[in-house]
Amino acid sequence: MNTSAKRALIPLGIFLALAALLFYGLQLDPRKIPSPLVDKPAPEFSLPDLKDPNQTLTRDILIGQVSLVNVWASWCPSCRQEHAELMRIAREHGVRVIGFNWKDTRPEALAMLQRYGDPYTVSLYDPDNKAGIDWGVYGAPETFIVDAEGIIRHKRVGPIDAQVWAEEIQPIVARYQGGKP
């Protein structure tokens, strides 16, 4: 094969390599994006309480028991989809669920909780994504499992339903609560 024929194959080889990478990337599950925060202390924050703007909440609320920190917004259809499951988890499993209201307005967020119920022990209010950036939030819903020492143990991107709870979230929560998954 002469030199000009070899040169002509270079763009084809590059194209095939890029196509293979694209095909591989399309097969990955976007919900399984690893978080650099897993197994590290939850980021510091100082945010107002959604219901009581005069109360400031800090990372200290995460210390003492295992928590699900659920990033949500009233404008998020998937958040409304998972809301009933979060209510069930809080009621039936006694898991502390902390809301992280993200890029929302206070009136709309409060209206959603009034309409659908409030599964949250407390809700952080982050309308400007000040803390969301530190937590690596890029969409809602997202849920973090934080152990009693304030260490992030798992991040879930996307809504939680009964199957996700039973197969993914609950076993991790049980492990850090001292039970067996």
From Swiss-Prot:
Protein topology in the membrane: Single-pass membrane protein
Gene it is expressed from: dsbE
GO MF term set: disulfide oxidoreductase activity
Keywords per UniProt: Cell inner membrane, Cell membrane, Cytochrome c-type biogenesis, Disulfide bond, Membrane, Redox-active center, Transmembrane, Transmembrane helix
Gene Ontology CC terms, in alphabetical order: outer membrane-bounded periplasmic space; plasma membrane
Segments on the Cytoplasmic face: 1-6
Membrane side Periplasmic: residue ranges: 27-181
Family stated for the protein in its record: Belongs to the thioredoxin family. DsbE subfamily.
Disulfides per UniProt: C76-C79
Places the protein is found: Cell inner membrane
Protein name: Thiol:disulfide interchange protein DsbE
